[in-house]
UniProtKB/Swiss-Prot annotation:
Name of encoding gene: Gabbr1
Family matches, as Pfam families: 7tm_3, ANF_receptor, Sushi
Record text on subunit structure and interactions: Heterodimer of GABBR1 and GABBR2. Homodimers may form, but are inactive. Interacts (via C-terminus) with ATF4 (via leucine zipper domain). Interacts with JAKMIP1.
Purpose of the protein: Component of a heterodimeric G-protein coupled receptor for GABA, formed by GABBR1 and GABBR2. Within the heterodimeric GABA receptor, only GABBR1 seems to bind agonists, while GABBR2 mediates coupling to G proteins. Ligand binding causes a conformation change that triggers signaling via guanine nucleotide-binding proteins (G proteins) and modulates the activity of down-stream effectors, such as adenylate cyclase.
Compartment annotation: Cell membrane; Postsynaptic cell membrane; Cell projection, Dendrite; Perikaryon
Domain remarks: Alpha-helical parts of the C-terminal intracellular region mediate heterodimeric interaction with GABBR2. The linker region between the transmembrane domain 3 (TM3) and the transmembrane domain 4 (TM4) probably plays a role in the specificity for G-protein coupling.
Family note: Belongs to the G-protein coupled receptor 3 family. GABA-B receptor subfamily.
Protein name (Swiss-Prot/TrEMBL): Gamma-aminobutyric acid type B receptor subunit 1
Residues with the Phosphothreonine modification: 872, 929
Keywords associated with the record: Cell membrane, Cell projection, Coiled coil, Disulfide bond, G-protein coupled receptor, Glycoprotein, Membrane, Phosphoprotein, Postsynaptic cell membrane, Receptor, Repeat, Signal, Synapse, Transducer, Transmembrane, Transmembrane helix
Length: 960
């Protein structure tokens, strides 16, 4: 809008050099140039808009601004007047350099400014004066010239007692110069530096001098116990104890309360030392190892990891650290899925991590054990784009390249295994180049300490922890200064301290607890458990070297991220294998093929049913109980129809439709079996019941009433309907999921396939199947038995019972085989469906073909299409087809018997001829004797009968 107001103004070029005094014009005020090293802030206009105009409207205001450490001298704001001029044009505006404003204040003193006004400009003079009991250290005057004060800023220092009159306060320290952690090699010189700096200050403990009494603990609790006894029971009295490593600090801190001593450690990281009930007077400038845990949890949340695994060396420091981590991740909604530990050999735990598919792994162990772990990691291939390892950051930078005879991995293999891992390390040296309370920067401290050491820092134990030891002395000095009333405040006499004086101990404790200052290691402050709060450095091993990727301040929950993290796979991996659930569906080719067969079977059943109904007046059909055959055809149709829902799964239907499909399977198959097999079973049952009676009960054969057959079928169907109804109401079928073992995909992707299969099931499925299979199996076995028993029965009432028996054989065999096989193959959807559906199809086909095709063939080939009335009118005889068949069979049997009789007669004639020939031959050899008057000579008792004699009764035996 303002630009629209300026459009009518003429665009006119400025004069040479940009005149400061614009010409009067009714159009507004001409744009003026800013002062040197300065600029003009145009309110409401952009830079492009300012370039497009030369005049500004009346009442428009501009503001001068200066660059760098400069201030505007003269009018800072000018306003366009109605006469076309700017306000206060007679006074120029300049940007001049100012001197540091810190010289305008003095702690414990006053500053007097002359020759200028605030802020301090060129020519300004300041004079410094200290308060009573303080004296000025430095020049009392300074002049501002071209932005610089002529002298360094002085400070006010408390008037101290002369050095010879200062009272000594003793510190008992234990430095581990050797052993598991030789941190005393660098920490002792750092403590000595701090004592020199503190004792040289007049504003801290002006009446006292801190002195050190120390021993080498060798990081051994036993050795430390000896020196602790010497410190406590030998003069002079020590006002505080300073142990180093965690094992020694645990011993000292637990015993110190008995002597009312404060314990201040510079190198202990064990989380167990944070227990205030066990260690009530313990403080440490070395942060607890649990300080890594908030950083780890923050990184887990940053990368969206919800499941992690851990592996630790079995020591107290790592066990307590892991316990703390477990509590923190639980609060953050993260789960530790697998936890492993080892004492010396990590081979088995690493294998377990691999077997459990651990992806995000936190490792807590010392440097030597770290090499063993990652040698096993390489062997198990537990590294790469799928895995992230979190390690402790205080290892040496080349720890994985160090020769170690206890492992059998090369440097190249170790380098490959550790690539990409994350480390968290406590910030022990202030990364900012700011001055600490000792007036030294962190870099100046490192340079000064390096000159003091007798060997290279990388070869000196505890060099990283040296800033913590230096700041520990400063924390102690400030606490004692506050307790003693240093700086003009009232306090207690430190020289009155003894091991029974709890009052002084309590005051020192409160002073230590409220410590807050800037040290060379950063901001020093203690939490409620006496542990140092500090920043955490986050690094990642990239290309064989560690790169800083961020810092984390747990006190403020502030994560400073440099976005320099690199991942082997291009992005952070998942915390677990991504499981893709896939359903196993029935083969559509198999389903379509069986469906076609089932459809053709239904068509065949309809044809057979139609044929049977159409020819129900034919006597031959009537004698086969056509209504039962009709029920068989209907039952086969229902069973064949069950094939369709049997093959439907999630590929075709939704989850909500699945229960209906399950019920359709059950009812169609159940009713189909009851009608189809039940009608055949009824036939064979009544044939066996009626036509296998003894002779005295032949009257039963004449009284086979059809309603009894229908009642039997109805009973079987009713039992199924009742059972199915109870099943559906009490325990209905529903969709259940069967889950299989995970499968690896063919592609190289970080996913796992979880196959699943849908089933129709209920809570007590086995019970219901037991009931069904129990009585259905009995029916099948009984049907086989009855079919076998009636195979030789011939009856006019049910003329197709032999075909029924054959159908029962086939149905029973298929059912008895298929039922257990499908239960075994239930997890293989194609095989189970193929067995079940093909058994239904084949049994239905066989039943229909065996029962109906012979009838069709007989009626077609013999032309027996007449009804019983028509047949009687045509022949005039009541002989039925069954009697004709019997007559034909009897005639055939008669012919066969006549043939046998002829053969026998021919044989008899032959034997008679042979007998006569022998009699004639014998009469020639023995002439005839006179006849006995009695009619013949008597034979002796032993004389055999004559072979030529022939008894008529014997001849008749030949015809039998």
């Amino acid at each position: 809008m303002l630009l629209l107001l300026l459009v009518p103004l003429f665009l006119r070029p400025l004069g040479a050099g940009g005149a400061q005094t614009p010409n009067a014009t009714s159009e507004g005020c001409q744009i003026i140039h800013p002062p040197w090293e300065g600029g003009i802030r145009y309110r409401g206009l952009t830079r492009d808009q300012v370039k497009a105009i030369n005049f500004l409207p009346v009442d428009y205001e501009i503001e001068y601004v200066c660059r760098g450490e400069r201030e505007v001298v003269g009018p800072k704001v000018r306003k366009c007047l109605a006469n076309g001029s700017w306000t206060d044009m007679d006074t120029p505006s300049r940007c001049v350099r100012i001197c540091s404003k810190s010289y305008l204040t003095l702690e414990n003193g006053k500053v007097f400014l002359t020759g200028g006004d605030l802020p301090a400009l060129d020519g300004a003079r300041v004079e410094f004066r200290c308060d009573p009991d303080f004296h000025l250290v430095g020049s009392s005057r300074s002049v501002c010239s071209q932005g610089q004060w002529s002298t360094p800023k002085p400070h006010c220092q408390v008037n101290r007692t002369p050095h010879s009159e200062r009272r000594a306060v003793y510190i008992g320290a234990l430095f581990p110069m050797s052993g598991g952690w030789p941190g005393g090699q660098a920490c002792q010189p750092a403590v000595e530096m701090a004592l020199e700096d503190v004792n040289s200050r007049r504003d801290i403990l002006p009446d006292y001098e801190l002195k050190l009494i120390h021993h080498d603990s060798k990081c051994d609790p036993g050795q430390a116990t000896k020196y602790l006894y010497e410190l406590l029971y030998n003069d002079p009295i020590k006002i505080i104890l300073m142990p180093g490593c965690s094992s020694v600090s645990t011993l000292v801190a637990e015993a110190a309360r008995m002597w009312n001593l404060i314990v201040l450690s510079y190198g202990s990281s064990s989380p167990a030392l944070s227990n205030r009930q066990r260690f009530p007077t313990f403080f440490r400038t070395h942060p607890s190892a649990t300080l890594h845990n908030p950083t780890r949890v923050k990184l887990f949340e940053k990368w969206g990891w919800k499941k992690i695994a851990t592996i630790q060396q079995t020591t107290e420091v790592f066990t307590s650290t892991l316990d703390d981590l477990e509590e923190r991740v639980k609060e953050a909604g993260i789960e530790i899925t697998f936890r492993q530990s080892f004492f010396s050999d990590p081979a088995v735990p690493v294998k377990n991590l691999k077997r459990q598919d651990a992806r995000i792994i936190v490792g807590l162990f010392y440097e030597t054990e770290a090499r063993k772990v990652f040698c096993e990691v390489y062997k198990e291939r537990l590294f790469g784009k799928k895995y992230v390892w979190f390690l402790i950051g205080w290892y040496a930078d080349n720890w994985f390249k160090t020769y170690d005879p206890s492992i059998n991995c090369t440097v190249e293999e170790m380098t490959e295994a550790v690539e990409g891992h994350i480390t968290t390390e406590i910030v022990m040296l202030n990364p900012a180049n700011t001055r600490s309370i000792s007036n030294m920067t962190s870099q100046e401290f490192v340079e000064k300490l390096t000159k003091r050491l007798k060997r290279h820092p990388e070869e000196t134990g505890g060099f990283q922890e040296a800033p913590l030891a230096y700041d520990a002395i400063w924390a102690l000095a400030l606490a004692l200064n506050k307790t003693s009333g240093g700086g003009g405040r009232s306090g207690v006499r430190l020289e009155d301290f003894n091991y029974n004086n709890q009052t002084i101990t309590d005051q020192i404790y409160r002073a230590m607890n409220s410590s807050s200052f800037e040290g060379v290691s950063g901001h020093v402050v203690f939490d409620a458990s006496g542990s140092r709060m500090a920043w955490t450095l986050i690094e990642q091993l990239q290309g064989g070297s560690y790169k800083k990727i961020g810092y984390y301040d747990s006190t403020k929950d502030d994560l400073s991220w440099s976005k320099t993290d690199k991942w082997i796979g291009g992005s952070p991996p998942a915390d677990q294998t991504l499981v893709i659930k896939t359903f196993r569906f029935l083969s559509q080719k198999l389903f379509i093929s069986v469906s076609v067969l089932s459809s053709l079977g239904i068509v065949l059943a309809v044809v057979c049913l139609s044929f049977n109904i159409y020819n129900s007046h034919v006597r031959y059909i009537q004698n086969s109980q056509p209504n039962l055959n009709n029920l068989t055809a209907v039952g086969c149709s229902l069973a064949l129809a069950a094939v369709f829902p049997l093959g439907l799964d999630g590929y075709h239907i939704g989850r909500s439709q699945f229960p209906f499909v399950c019920q359709a399977r059950l009812w169609l198959l159940g009713l189909g079996f009851s009608l189809g097999y039940g009608s055949m079973f009824t036939k064979i049952w009544w044939v066996h019941t009626v036509f296998t009676k003894k002779e005295e009960k032949k009257e039963w054969r004449k009284t086979l009433e059809p309603w009894k057959l229908y009642a039997t079928v109805g009973l079987l169907v009713g039992m199924d309907v009742l059972t199915l109804a109870i099943w559906q109401i009490v325990d209905p079928l529903h969709r259940t999921i069967e889950t299989f073992a995970k499968e690896e995909p063919k592609e190289d992707i970080d996913v796992s396939i979880l196959p699943q299969l849908e089933h129709c099931s209920s809570k007590k499925m086995n019970t219901w199947l037991g009931i069904f299979y129990g009585y259905k199996g009995l029916l099948l076995l009984l049907g086989i038995f009855l079919a076998y028993e009636t195979k030789s029965v011939s009856t006019e009432k049910i003329n197709d019972h032999r075909a029924v028996g054959m159908a029962i054989y086939n149905v029973a065999v298929l059912c008895l085989i298929t039922a257990p096989v499908t239960m075994i193959l239930s997890s293989q959807q194609d095989a189970a469906f193929a067995f079940a559906s093909l058994a239904i199809v084949f049994s239905s086909y066989i039943t229909l073909v065996v029962l109906f095709v012979p009838k069709m063939r007989r009626l077609i080939t013999r032309g027996e299409w007449q009804s019983e009335t028509q047949d009687t009118m045509k022949t005039g005889s009541s002989t039925n087809n069954n009697e004709e068949e019997k007559s034909r069979l009897l005639e055939k049997e008669n012919r066969e018997l006549e043939k046998i009789i002829a053969e026998k007669e021919e044989r008899v004639s032959e034997l008679r001829h042979q007998l006569q020939s022998r009699q004639q031959l014998r009469s020639r050899r023995h002439p005839p004797t006179p006849p006995d008057p009695s009619g013949g000579l008597p034979r002796g008792p032993s004389e055999p009968p004559d072979r030529l004699s022939c008894d008529g009764s014997r001849v008749h035996l030949l015809y039998k």
